[in-house]
Structures are given as structure tokens and as C-alpha cells.
Amino acid sequence: MSEYTGEVVHGGPSDVRELAHLTIRKASVSEQDNNAYLLTCRATGEQLLIDAADDPHRLRALVDEGTGWLDAVVTTHRHWDHHRALADVVEHTGARVLAGAQDADELPVPVGERLTHGDRVTFGEVELEVIQLRGHTPGSVALLYRDPEGPAHLFTGDSLFPGGVGNTFGDAVAFASLVDDVEQRVFATLDDDTWFYPGHGKDSTLGAERPHLAEWRARGW
């Protein structure tokens, strides 16, 4: 298997990263380059999908690339482009539905588990930590996997990208909230080798982005 790069294109194949206890599959599922991530517990085969963003047929194929069944779907935030296929995926898989508490009522299906900062999400023998990053939306959540045999892995939705935090649409209060949370809850607590996976586009590491934090705050976006 080729080395994981995180570079995927709409209509193209998944990129796959094999960790000791977890397999991560990344696929681009829309013309907006929305990323969907399928996480598979290697011990039990149970699976969790992050953001059923679009293209239900592609997402079903992604699930089949793993073990073929889906246990849970987490929606990172309320924006329409991150849950266009959620209703279809839930209908066809029966997966449990999780989302940030403040965004849950905006989703097209009932949310069974409303997530808040510090919660844990488990599937199989895998545990993810919930990090609320307030600003892009009130209920935006990131999911952290602490690999016992390597660097941490962080799924950030639209709250953190290579080159800056997520869009806060000119709202200075929301921007301050987001950049504060990203600094305090991500960069202040996690190591530089933490790999993060955003809701659109390419991945990065915290070490690559850390030198630019003051620049992001100063420019205001």
C-alpha cells in the first residue's frame, strides 16, 4: 500500500492510512472538496464516519471499502455542505447519529448523541475525544484520536485548516472565540507531530501551522 498523503480528489480513490489499531480512509465527496473520513477499528471491524457530506453512493462504497457496515456518523457542524448525505446514510445503515449539542437541531435527522467538550465517542476498541471549537458554528466539534503507538490524529471539520482557522464570516466575536479555542484546546495541549484532517482540502500537522498562530490572530481571519 502506498504511503498516506491525504491528497484526494472528487471522483477519485480514497487515501488510506493504517495505524496499529485504527484504519483511516479519506475521500472527497463533492465539488466543494468536502472530505469524508471513515474510521475502522482494526480489532472489531466497527466503523465511524465523519461528515456524510455528499454523494451517498460514494459514501456507501467507502463503507464497503472497510468492513461493510457502519456503526456511527459524526457531523462536525451544522453547515449544509457537511450533511447533504446524512439522511440517506442513516436510512441505509441504521448508524447512530452524533453531533455537537448546539448544532444538533439544525441537522436533517434526529441526533441521538449530543456532544459537548470533553465527551468521549467509542466504537469497537477505539476512543475519540471531543474538542469543541466554537466560532465557525456554535456547536462545531473536532475529534481526537490518541494513537498509543504514534502521533495523535485530529479531525477538525471546518474549524482548522492548513493556513488558518475556519471562516467566521466577518464576525469579530466569533473569530476571537474560534482562535482562542484553537490555541488553548489544540495547540496548547497537543504535540507538533499531531496530524490534522480538515473538512475540505489537504491535511497538515500542528507543527507546520504553529509558527503562524500570531499571524492568524493579527489578520483577523
Language model features: what each stretch is:
Residues 68, 137-221:
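Metallo-beta-lactamase
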